């Protein structure tokens, strides 16, 4: 038996205070926090896909090598968002056991190329674009042209999108 002293961190159990379809308000360690609940979105779900599109989407969502460009490698470039997919996930900190919700966002351009990120800011910007640009399913989608930008955050640089125009050819 060793005579080592170990510092043990005590944390409170998180208590859910309230919940909406978009957020969970929790009380944890003496503070209130709002945790986002991410939705799965797929702009192609309203139409029948070709075999090639289905194969590409499967490989994209399965993480196949070369199926998407990391968004941080595309900073400064402009992208016409023809289609998009968002996939929520939960990760667990192995040291603390704390769960954190996240979301993967895939933007698909007019050439069928995908750009991927786990940036929460991009997810929320995409949702605001859905309000601004309409919906695929009802034919009101105006294809936005966005610039991929790097933004300063408390934990380093993050990704986001800046609306720069609309694609006139649909």
Swiss-Prot record:
**Which GO terms fall under biological process for this protein?**
DNA replication; viral DNA genome replication
Q: Which GO terms describe its molecular function?
A: DNA binding
Domain of life assignment: Viruses
Keyword field: DNA replication, DNA-binding, Early protein, Viral DNA replication
Chain spans, region Oligomerization: 1-26
Task performed by this protein: Single-stranded DNA-binding protein required for the elongation during viral DNA replication by strand displacement. Displaced viral DNA strands are transiently coated with the ssDNA-binding protein and therefore protected againt nucleases. The latter is then probably removed by the replisome that performs lagging strand synthesis or during the events that lead up to the recombination process. Has helix-destabilizing activity since it removes secondary structure from the ssDNA in replicative intermediates.
Q: State the family named in the UniProt similarity comment for this chain.
A: Belongs to the phi29likevirus single-strand-binding protein family.
Which comment does the entry carry about domains?
A: The N-terminus is required for oligomerization.
**What is the recorded name of this protein?**
Single-stranded DNA-binding protein
């Amino acid at each position: 038996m060793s005579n080592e002293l170990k510092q043990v961190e005590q944390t409170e159990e998180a208590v859910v205070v309230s919940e909406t379809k978009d957020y969970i308000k929790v009380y944890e360690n003496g503070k209130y926090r709002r945790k986002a609940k991410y939705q799965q979105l797929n702009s192609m779900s309203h139409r029948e896909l070709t075999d090639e599109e289905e194969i590409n989407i499967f490989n994209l969502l399965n993480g196949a090598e070369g199926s998407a460009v990391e968004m941080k490698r595309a900073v400064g470039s402009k992208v016409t968002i023809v289609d998009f997919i968002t996939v929520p996930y939960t990760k667990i900190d192995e040291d603390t056991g704390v769960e954190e919700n996240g979301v993967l966002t895939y933007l698909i351009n007019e050439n069928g190329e995908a750009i991927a990120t786990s940036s929460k800011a991009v997810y929320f910007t995409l949702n605001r674009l859905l309000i601004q640009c309409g919906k695929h399913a009802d034919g009101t989608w105006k294809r936005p042209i966005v610039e991929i930008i790097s933004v300063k955050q408390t934990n380093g640089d993050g990704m986001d999108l800046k609306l720069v125009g609309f694609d006139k050819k649909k």
